[in-house]
Swiss-Prot record:
Tissues in which the protein is found: Expressed by the skin glands.
Coiled-coil features, chain-numbered ranges: none
Species: Phyllomedusa sauvagei
Record's protein name: Phylloseptin-S1
Keyword Zinc annotated: no
Length: 66
């Protein structure tokens, strides 16, 4: 009977360890995705801030040739 208890505890322990590892990997993946989303948003903001400069540049070129 003691052998069965030890085996059962070993199986449960190994199951918990593998579950913990899977959850940690899942958390890391979610953090990487979140970081990627933040990078994409910051790139979009940088591009949007350049639009007024581009428009004014195009307008000045149009005046020069127009």
């Amino acid at each position: 009977m003691a052998f069965l208890k030890k085996s059962l505890f070993l199986v449960l322990f190994l199951g918990l360890v593998s579950l913990s590892i899977c959850e940690e990997e899942k958390r890391e993946t979610e953090e990487e995705e979140h970081d990627q989303e933040e990078d994409d948003k910051s790139e979009e903001k940088r591009f949007l801030s350049l639009i007024p400069h581009i428009v004014s540049g195009v307008a000045s070129i149009a005046k020069h040739f127009g």
